[in-house]
Amino acid sequence: MGILEQLENPKFKATKSEKTLIEYIKSDLDNIIYKSISIIAKESGVGEATITRFTKKLGFNGFQDFKVTLAKEISNKKNTSIINLHVHRDESVTETANKMLKSSINILEQTVKQIDLDLMCKCRDLIMNAKRVYFIGIGYSGIAATDINYKFMRIGFTTVPVTDSHTMVIMSSITNDDDVIVAISNSGTTKEVIKTVKQAKENGTKIITLTEDSDNPLRKLSDYELTYTSAETIFETGSISSKIPQIFLLDLLYTEVIKEMFSEAVEKKIKTTSAILND
């Protein structure tokens, strides 16, 4: 029996809070799979723990597992593509492009609204005072880590991109309290990244995390947590909905650093550009 069938089944025994959650899910099926557990909890008025227990009651390992199955059901029911459940197989390129544009604008607007200005400044100062900065991430988050590492390196920072688990293990064993790790993971559940951060914290290394706004294990390990709302489903791993806020927040952090060290940053940028052109 599918999720939707279970929710409609009169024999399904639900608590008062679970009934509230069921009504919320049924009223927002088109968008529920794009929302984090924290957003659902806030909008439905039901606690995150209740949501987790409810999904396990339905036979799932947790909220993410629940969303995977629900996404499949909705996809099959609406005959839509699993690449993006708002994109239909038979629509024109223009329609798809406009949907993606609108989605990108909405994501950026949500990201800006969530920014904690004081926290961003603290992250900026932490990086500026660090001896070394490690940007770590696996998969698509690793791409974001590599991109921002290159930018900081161009203005004179000693930075290291770490995007594979083996190197992470080595790196985390030798970091110290002069170092900063910026750990990037959309879900905040990437095991390799979590393991690395735990080890580095034992060495006194300061941790900045960048994850979606959910009750995830990685952000709980951070000294400073930067979060964003991601509309990414399990089928959209690496989609624009997670990459846009990641890149935007990292670029904002980078820009804030440049503003503080403007003349020096410009000088270093000129030197590195010259070195590249003369290579």
From Swiss-Prot:
Q: Which Gene Ontology molecular function entries are recorded, alphabetically?
A: carbohydrate derivative binding; DNA binding; DNA-binding transcription factor activity
Q: What are the HTH rpiR-type domain coordinates in residue numbering?
A: 1-77
UniProt name for this protein: Uncharacterized HTH-type transcriptional regulator CPE0189
Database matches in Pfam families: HTH_6, SIS
Q: Which UniProt keywords apply?
A: DNA-binding, Transcription, Transcription regulation
Instruction: Provide the SIS domain boundaries.
Output: 123-263
Biological processes per GO annotation: carbohydrate derivative metabolic process
User: InterPro entries this protein is in?
Assistant: Homeodomain-like_sf, HTH_RpiR, RpiR-like, RpiR-like_SIS, SIS_dom, SIS_dom_sf, WH-like_DNA-bd_sf
According to the entry, DNA is bound by residues in 37-56
